[in-house]
Amino acid sequence: MNIAADIVGREAGPEPAAIDLRWLMAYNAALGEVSEAAHALFPVCYEWPANRTLRVASGLQALNERLVHAQHDLVIHRAPRAGETLQVAGRIVSVAQRRPGAFVVMRMQARGAAGDAVSTTDYGMLYRGVQLQGPTRAIEKAEDPPQHEAQLPPVGEIAVAATAAHVYTECARIWNPIHTE
């Protein structure tokens, strides 16, 4: 199995994402929080449709069983608000061969009605056992996270209900088998 290096630059969107209060509150509830404000990780919800569209358009969807969500760098420019419709676009910004497989980074960008930046995410996917056809390519810089200087000690345990994955999937509106199967 291969991923062609020439997928760099492929785009999807912009696609509209209508943010409603029910969605904001449901996402918070799935994480055990009670709030009407957008959770810091809520952007994954409105980015999901454009993410899927981009994977289909670039031929990556056929390799989903090999995909590991390996990296996630989210910049929040401002919080999304209930009642607004964002425009979400995605673009593949880099590909590289790594020892375990091909590594692909897509950049998701959400903008408000006035064109103002709401969030930017570099979403890194490792395709295990897949080879990159062609050289490493990048049209935008997407940095690896810094390495920890020391191993982090455990801080405790968190009980996770057997139904948590299903609740999260429904409340996030991210219907992805990785959460539930």
Outline where the language-model segments fall.
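Hot-dog-fold acyl-thioester-processing enzymes
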Residues: 1-69, 132, 136-140, 147-181
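HotDog/MaoC-like acyl-thioester-processing domains
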Residues: 1-10, 71-160
